[in-house]
């Protein structure tokens, strides 16, 4: 019909005194991954920020303990297959958000051990002073900035 149904709240973070940001449904529609923090929308600045997973058909919510660390986990993006995701984390030094990748099993809802995006120079992250706040996965090479949106979707 091209129309939306009645809105439905699937999780009330405010009941736990928390805030949700970056909710993203998995490509198969089975899961909703989101960032949970104590307050606000700029979770990258909150060390307590963690990734959570809601199972859509049961409403069960759990912390993604297999990827969360003692520091910030924030913005995340599913791969087009739903078998991988990337997220920003400050787990290395508490200062700079770095892109970590993890596999995901849609049958079990479990993530694999996260790993940092490899670089040619093993010391790259020791001297790189920029942050990966919003990592995105793309499906094709980006030849120029005007084509970025096509590569993401």
What is the role of each PLM region?
Residues 1-153:
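Sequence signature of WD/YWTD-type beta-propeller architectures
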